[in-house]
Amino acid sequence: MTKGEIAAILEEIAALLELKGENPFKIRAYANAARSLETFGGNLPDLQDEEALAKIPGIGKSIAEKIKELAATSSL
């Protein structure tokens, strides 16, 4: 998976959370993570490295785990 594809999935998760009426902070976290990932200068192998993910502003531990899983398996 490319980082663009992963960012699109994170945006889709944010939209689905909004439709479900979830916590606005959680929705914003996914949307911000998607934007941060789109502008991230690294390549796909870096998305499987927890240290590299931790350096991306706007990506917390929980979302970093989801990104790592998506990069490794192409599914959640």
Label the predicted regions.
Residues 1-76:
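Long, highly charged, low-complexity intrinsically disordered interaction regions
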